[in-house]
Structure formats: C-alpha cells, structure tokens
C-alpha cells in the first residue's frame, strides 16, 4: 500500500493571545501535514525525534491518536522535547520563540523502506539542519 512519509521536527506549541496562554498543541510544519493526512485515512508515517519526557509522550500519543505510524519516531534519552511559544497578534499572526536542546549528536533512527510510489515530505528544519 502506498505510504506518505513525513520527515520533520516536532514540538509543542504553547499559543498565547493577549499574553495569556490559551492552549498547548503538538506541531511543526511537516507534523501538521502528516497528521492531516492520517486523519483522512492516508497510510501516514512520521520520522522525527522527541525527548523521553512528558512532552515527547504527549506528541507520540497525539500522532497515534491521529492514525500516524510512530514506529520511526526516535526517542532520545535525557533530551528535552522542543517547545515553542506562539504569541498571536490582533490579526492572529504568530511571533515564535523556540526552546530546544542544543543537541549536535547525529540522529540515530531506523528508516522505513521507501517504494517507488511512496511520497516523502521534508520539513523546513530537517531540510537545512540534517543533524
């Protein structure tokens, strides 16, 4: 069966309106795309990394609940999952501040077999930062 494989960063977005936290949701550009595909029944798989922390567990659970295969999510021991603060202006445009571990270790993860008819989506973060 044809797969859609997303490769990208995942983080927890804490969204502020009028300088007050309104909600916290998992996110990331490729993350959002692959979750949307999982929700409509696509054979969706996501390659990413999370920490072995509460935020990482929340992210992995969210992926599973939205029909995204998490077999290729790398859980990094002792690493904190990335968090972003999204401050919305009056037009709901976001100004982001990112918090992530300065991890320069290469990503060590299992890769899925990619067939000729599979689709692979690359996120902006991993497109410019392969480590």
What is the meaning of each model-derived region?
Residues 15-16, 130:
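Short N-terminal helix/helix-N-cap motif within the alpha/beta-hydrolase-1
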Residues 10, 29, 125:
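Active-site metal-binding loops of divalent metal-dependent hydrolases
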Residues 1-15:
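Acidic-glycine-rich active-site phosphate/pyrophosphate-binding loop
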Residues 1-5, 64, 70, 93-131:
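Ribokinase/PfkB-type carbohydrate-kinase core domain
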Residues 8, 47-48, 124:
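Small/polar loops that bind or transfer phosphate-bearing groups
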Residues 3, 17-84, 88-93, 101-106:
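Substrate-binding N-lobe of the ribokinase-like
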Residues 11-14, 37-43, 115-120:
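A short alpha-helix capping/helix-coil boundary motif
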């Amino acid at each position: 069966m044809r797969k859609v494989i997303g490769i990208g960063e995942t983080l927890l977005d804490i969204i502020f309106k009028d300088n007050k936290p309104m909600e916290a949701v998992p996110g990331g550009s490729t993350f959002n795309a692959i979750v949307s595909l999982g929700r409509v029944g696509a054979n969706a798989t996501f390659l990413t990394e999370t920490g072995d922390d509460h935020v990482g567990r929340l992210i992995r659970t969210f992926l599973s609940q939205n029909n995204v295969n998490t077999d290729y999510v790398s859980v990094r021991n002792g690493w904190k999952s990335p968090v972003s603060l999204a401050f919305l202006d009056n037009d709901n445009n976001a100004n982001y501040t990112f918090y992530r571990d300065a991890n320069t270790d290469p990503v060590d993860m299992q890769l899925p077999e990619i067939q000729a008819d599979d689709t692979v989506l690359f996120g902006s973060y991993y497109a410019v930062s392969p480590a």
